Amino acid sequence: MGSLSFASETKKELTGIEVKPCCLKAELSALIRMNGSISFSNRRLLLNIQTENAAIARRIYTLLKKGYDVVVELLVRKKMRLKKNNVYIVRVVEGTHELLSDLKIMEEGFSFVHAISPELVQKKCCKRSYLRGAFLAGGSVNNPETSSYHLEIFSLYREHNESLCELMNTSFHLHARTLERKKGFITYLKEAEKIAEFLSVIGAHQALLRFEDVRIVRDMRNSVNRLVNCETANLNKTIGAALRQVENIRYIDETIGLDQLPEKLREIAKLRIAYQDVTLKELGEMVSGGKISKSGINHRLRKLDEIAERLRAGQPIDFHKSL
């Protein structure tokens, strides 16, 4: 995907999507509501839509020219602070009020509407387009290779943030949630499956494929790691038990001698000393007089552990109760 971030590549893909006439308003309304500002110059109402992404600026310019009879300029400024990126400004210099009214952003008397107008998102395709515009304007998504999955859309206004969340949940069941931030509000997704669904909803199919590819590999790697960790833990437990058993058997041998043990315990004790690395199942296959189950071998080894502990404590041992 080159040096661009996953979020940048996703947005680049979205700016190439063809928009149906009925969806143009929805996408443009989101882009302008979230990235636009108005000002007055020579008694004219100007609309400035600002972005640091050249492809998004071209997208806004194209949608405006395609859908409206307005006078539009495209300006480029250089940021002087921190990252000296270009800032692109799409400026509407004529027909601003009519445009904002048609996009349900401004009412009569220059009053702004922050919630999403139901009129703009009546069709499913228009709902998708509004969400696409919102993601282009204020969205970000973590690279799927990072430690946590996260997608969010930032909005300055609570009312817009809540209506955005409602649109995502009511129409597409995305389990989106909202959160207040220092300078505004976010609608966000944390579940990998829901992020994948959102990418599909807004038409980012190449990004979705990459996201799913990385997610499958990552989940597989996590499963393998969990399996290895589990196997390692079990192995460590088995080794620890075997070492304890050998130590106890040697203590019995040094204290009273293995010959004092009942025959069945004596045989297991000698086998465990001779074959310290084998499993209980393998020990069970080595005994004379037929195969013994793992639980049977484990029972005898526990009895040997008990005898060793009683010897250490100086307690009497009744070998008749040892089996």
From Swiss-Prot:
It holds the Pfam family WhiA_N. Residues 279-313 bind DNA. InterPro entries: Homing_endonucl, Sporu_reg_WhiA_N_dom, Sporulation_regulator_WhiA, Sporulation_regulator_WhiA_C, WhiA_LAGLIDADG_dom. Keywords: Cell cycle, Cell division, DNA-binding. GO terms for molecular function: DNA binding. GO terms for biological process: cell division; regulation of sporulation. SUPFAM superfamilies: Homing endonucleases. Gene3D superfamilies: Homing endonucleases (3.10.28.10). The keyword Cell cycle applies. The keyword Cell cycle applies. HAMAP family: HTH_type_WhiA. Involved in cell division and chromosome segregation. Belongs to the WhiA family. This is Probable cell division protein WhiA.
